[in-house]
């Protein structure tokens, strides 16, 4: 896999798009368990935070240190999301091509990911979102 190197703040949009793809794929399944719904909510919140970063950075000049810190965090977010998306994407495409996909999609995803993996992903996503909020606070003060 080619490493993701953010060359501009437009790359933030790529991270938001992956988060949205995962969110959309999970949201489209019905009858999800509590943990599953929490992950969906966390992805939505993360996507909103990344979108906020994009808007703030377009309007706020940054020094090189802040720019590098934000780029490093965006790179880490991108890696996390790509790995998770890579685990579920192939199943989403196959399952969504038929009419019975909604309940099967959830079952297959949980069978593949297991509750611990989803909880671990949620925790990492929450940490990245917290880091993003810290960066936002720092550049807007």
Feature roles, as predicted:
Residues 1-73, 84-95, 99-102, 106, ...:
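N-terminal amphipathic alpha-helical segments
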Residues 115-118, 124, 128, 132-136:
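Alpha-helical bundle protein-protein interaction modules that mediate dimerization/oligomerization
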Residues 72-89, 117-120, 124:
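Elongated alpha-helical scaffolds
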